[in-house]
Swiss-Prot record:
PANTHER family, per database record: AMINOPEPTIDASE, PROTEASE M1 ZINC METALLOPROTEASE
Protein's recorded name: Aminopeptidase N
Active site, per annotation: 345 (proton acceptor)
UniProt-annotated glycosylation sites, renumbered to this chain: 60, 550, 605
Organism: Plutella xylostella
């Protein structure tokens, strides 16, 4: 019945369409090029869609596209994916045309390959620049994998409720309606949605027209929306639901309409999103000096969503856990993530929506700026969160994935849908954001801000390339009194068009000299690999005689050369130590001569607070990674790390935790591993006493993150008090599940309780997981369940990844394996065997377009042995023909990282063992034991005083 109604209406809209038999014309496309030929472009779309969430098989639609040929042509080429074309009509769009009502349509071919090209032929040659309108009616399947238009579900009062929503970025607008699905081909969109009357919340990018609600078709209500501004097709969004909302209508802190839609009964959890979202938009408008363009910016929390969120212009869609805050359930980490994601998506309203990329080769023009501003703009609203301090930790994390030869550059040419999706990786996000932060500092913050304001105003509603950005910045630099050594495009082309990053080695030219000798090499985790890639590197430094970490402007530049460069440094001869790269604002590592490393270790162990906390984090991260790479003796890194027993700030400890996690992986099972564990317990003892399991009233925002690091180290590495306390807390929680257990420590407590293999603990937590509808609680539980050491329960958990009746949402299934991979060697090896055996079934069940890369990237951080290398080779050979571009890149990174770890064992294991045995073995046991007692007593006393 509904299908007949839809088809009847399509006939009325299209006039007298030519009926087609799809089987006779669905031909294999012969285009070698995935990019549209560019011989025509759209200016206007009128899209009508029929959505019924209860009829989950398919939906119908019609689209009328105003098309302008660039040249005289007899065909146009656009995109359509996984749909049946029902009819096509084409006619002249010029009132002066004598044949205005003539149907120009002749035939069409629809590619069955992944080009998704729809070629439409006409009865005559179309004149250049003379517009026509092409009307297409079609039937399409709801997307099975949350990319396109799809159905999501939730349970309310025991009944399943369905809704329709969408995710069209990057290449899935073509799955919603035939269109020119490339970001540069912008147009105005008019949308009409037909939906059953029971679905009271029907939304798209623009508000409803004043006379929009009409019941002109039985069983459907017609919702007509205002025309958009010129925009890309991937930014469209749809929602047909029974949601409720809160809004800023009665108490606005921002002058545009904002609503937050979510499941009925969850409106109280949307208050933070509404409040922070408005304040964040105000700050972004101030910063960019450019007003938000649409009349509304609504936010939607949906139960099933592939990404964390999507910046659709005017209707931003989020996964529930990325938007809703439940007091007593949402962790501090999740709350911070919500703030970051809201800021990220708000930023896209300028970087991506107002100014979009010319093609997905330049994904970073969207995602790099959104990554930078997700911290920077959050910091403008909530400075107490210390987001720009935490940014350095995120940069250090991306160093790991950027330190392999196979990594792609920031600007990376892509053509196929698989390649395009693969560009949405850590390079486009975290690396690009880090390079943008470096640019902010070497330009100065005010020149950077003015440059972005000029870029946005100049490129508004246009498709941009990096040259457009660089030219705007250069114009502002030229008008200022600030100078840089080269033109900006020369500097930035090396950072954006080459993969990887440098390690800058700095030495005194002589013991009493006033100059540095500086060289650069590409930093690669595998020390057996080499590269001649070089960069234009901004340099600044601090001397022990002039400790000023605040001025981060360049004091010199390192040219793009392998040869050594001499840099004059007045006063160097009087300095006991020096540090290059203030606040780690430059995207590079720094190595020194052994004498300077020893001097830095001394000052850290004596008076560490004289060094900026971000540079303390830098010294920890650089030293251990340089040692891992074979460029620094591990004994120097360990000597420096001793100071951590005095370190109270979270940021250096986050850097240290990453270094220690790698060492734990490569040392696990070795005879020296117990000594390494002893060292970690020694370093964390004062903080374990100070932080414990209980949160203090009014503690700093980042303290829960710090507490989790300390508790995880202690419970994992044998602190009996930590293990017994965690087990007691879990048992008390089981005995009284309604009691309050700080959500910030729940994953640690649950994980510790599961490591013992207790089946009852697992069953209790699994029952809670399946019973709760709260996405925050589900995340906590799923991340803990992977810690189980019970093989039977682990196998059951893994089965949920591929089971047809899985109780884990598709978007979360990859977390089952990731949590197991991260929990320890036994579960990691079990997960590897499971993936090796079942990857073909895993792909379509874990949000296959991105979930598998999350799993593979977790392996890239943890696999270390020759046995692992053999299994990955087997895995690669077995599934090579089904890998996506992103999966292939992840597998290549795994292989490089394993090779580096095998090299590590031959080059570094003996040095690490010698240092640990000297300091924590039989030879040093009595001295260390006495030192531990004295230091811990002193530190606890100091902490209690402070």
């Amino acid at each position: 019945m509904r299908l007949l109604i839809c088809l009847t209406l399509l006939g009325l809209v299209c006039g007298n369409p030519v009926q087609l038999t799809d089987n006779s014309i669905a031909l294999q496309n012969t285009y070698d090029n995935y990019v549209l030929p560019g011989e025509s472009f759209p200016t206007f779309y009128d899209v009508q869609l029929f959505f019924d969430p209860e009829y989950e098989a398919s939906f119908n639609g019609t689209v009328a596209i105003r098309v302008v040929p660039r040249i005289a042509t007899q065909e146009i080429v656009l995109h359509a994916m996984e749909m049946e074309i029902l009819s096509i009509r084409a006619y002249s769009d010029l009132p002066s045309d004598d044949n205005l009502n003539e149907n120009l349509f002749s035939s069409y071919t629809l590619a069955t390959d992944d080009t998704h090209l729809l070629k439409i032929q006409f009865t005559r040659v179309l004149d250049a620049l003379q517009p026509i309108t092409v009307e297409i009616s079609y039937s399409a399947q709801y997307a099975p994998n949350m990319f396109g238009v799809y159905v999501s579900r939730y349970v309310e009062n025991g009944a399943t409720v369905s809704l329709v929503t969408s995710q069209l970025q990057p290449t899935f607008a073509r799955r919603a309606f035939p269109c020119y699905d490339e970001p540069a081909l912008k147009a105005v969109f008019r949308t009409t949605i037909y939906a059953p009357p029971a679905y009271n919340v029907v939304e798209t990018n623009m508000p409803l027209r004043t006379d929009s609600l009409k019941s002109d078709r039985p069983g459907f209500t017609k919702h007509e929306f205002q025309d958009t501004l010129v925009m890309s097709s991937y930014l469209l969004a749809y929602l047909v639901s029974k949601f409720d909302y809160i809004s800023n209508e009665n108490n606005p802190t921002y002058d545009k309409s904002m609503k937050v839609f979510s499941r009925p009964g969850t409106q109280n959890t949307a208050e933070f999103a509404l409040d922070f979202g408005q304040k964040n938009m105000v700050e972004l408008e101030k910063y960019t000096e450019f007003p938000y363009a649409f009349p509304k910016i609504d936010k939607v929390a949906v139960p099933d969503f592939a990404a964390g969120a999507m910046e659709n212009w005017g209707l931003v869609i989020y996964r529930e856990i990325a938007l809703l805050v439940q007091e007593g359930v949402t962790t501090t980490s999740t709350l911070q993530g919500i703030g970051r994601i809201i800021s990220h998506e708000n930023t896209h309203q300028w970087f991506g929506n107002e100014v979009g990329p010319d093609s997905w080769t330049y994904t970073w023009l969207n995602e790099g700026f959104a990554n930078f501003f997700e911290s920077f703009a959050t910091d403008l609203v909530l400075p107490e969160w210390r987001m720009m301090d935490q940014f350095v930790i995120n940069m250090q994390n991306v160093f790991q994935s950027d330190a392999v030869l196979s990594v792609n550059p920031i600007t990376f040419e892509v053509r196929t849908p698989s390649q395009i999706l693969g560009t949405f990786n850590s390079v486009a996000y975290q690396k690009s954001g880090s390079v943008i932060r470096m640019m902010q500092h070497f330009l100065t913050p005010e020149i950077f801000r003015k440059s972005l304001a000029l870029y946005i105003s100049r490129m508004s509603r246009k498709a941009a390339k990096p040259t457009d950005l660089f030219e705007a910045i250069q114009e502002v630099v030229d008008a200022s009194d600030h100078s840089i050594r080269w033109r900006l495009s020369i500097i930035m082309n090396r950072w954006t068009q080459q993969g990887g990053f440098p390690v800058v080695t700095v030495r005194r030219s002589a013991p009493s000299a006033q100059s540095f000798v500086i060289t650069q090499r590409r930093f690669l985790t595998d020390s057996t690999q080499e590269s001649n890639t070089v960069w234009n590197v901004p340099l600044n430094w601090v001397l022990s005689t002039d400790v000023n970490f605040n001025d981060t402007r360049p004091m010199a530049w390192l040219p793009p050369q392998l040869a050594a460069e001499a840099v004059q440094v007045p006063g160097l001869q009087n300095a006991e130590w020096f540090i290059v790269n203030k606040q780690q604002t430059g995207y590079y590592r720094v190595n020194y001569d052994p004498e300077n490393w020893r001097a830095l270790a001394k000052v850290l162990n004596d008076t560490h607070e004289i060094i900026h906390l971000l540079n303390r984090a830098q010294l920890i991260d650089d030293s251990f990674n340089l040692a891992r790479n074979g460029r620094l003796d591990y004994s120097l890194a360990f000597d420096l790390s001793r100071y951590l027993v005095q370190e109270r700030d979270y940021i250096p400890w986050a850097a240290a935790n990453a270094a220690f996690n790698y060492l734990n992986s490569v040392l696990s099972g070795s005879s020296v591993h117990p000594l390494f564990q002893e060292y970690l317990l020694f370093l964390t003892a004062p903080l374990y006493q100070r932080l414990g399991f209980n949160a203090a009233t009014g503690e700093e925002h980042v303290t829960p993150f710090h507490r989790n690091i300390i508790l995880n180290i202690n419970c994992l590495h044998g602190n009996e008090d930590c293990v017994s306390t965690a087990e007691t807390l879990l048992q008390n929680f089981r005995d009284n599940p309604t009691q309050t257990l700080n959500p910030d420590i729940q994953t640690t407590v649950f994980c510790s309780g599961l490591r013992g293999g207790d089946v009852d603990n697992f069953n209790f937590l699994w029952a809670r997981y399946t019973a709760t509808q709260d996405s925050s609680e589900q995340s906590i539980l799923l991340n803990a369940l992977g810690c189980t050491s019970n093989a039977d329960r682990r196998d059951f958990l893994f089965s949920q990844v591929i089971a047809s009746d899985s109780q884990v949402r598709e978007q979360d299934r990859h977390s089952v394996l990731v949590s197991a991979i991260n929990s320890g060697p036994d579960n990691m090896n079990a997960a590897l065997d499971f993936v090796l055996e079942n990857f073909a079934n895993i792909q379509p069940n874990v949000q296959g377009l991105t979930g598998t890369t999350n799993i593979l990237n977790a392996f890239a951080r943890t696999l270390t042995t020759q046995e692992h290398a053999n299994k990955i080779d087997e895995f690669s050979n077995k599934y090579a023909n089904v890998f996506t571009a992103g999966e292939m890149a992840s597998v290549a990174a795994i292989k490089e990282n394993i090779a580096a770890s095998i090299t590590w064992n031959s080059q570094n294991a003996a040095t690490v063992e010698a240092w640990l045995r000297k300091n924590f073995g039989t030879d040093g046991a009595s001295t260390v034991s006495a030192s531990i007692t004295i230091i811990i007593s002193a530190m606890v006393a100091i902490y209690n005083i402070l």
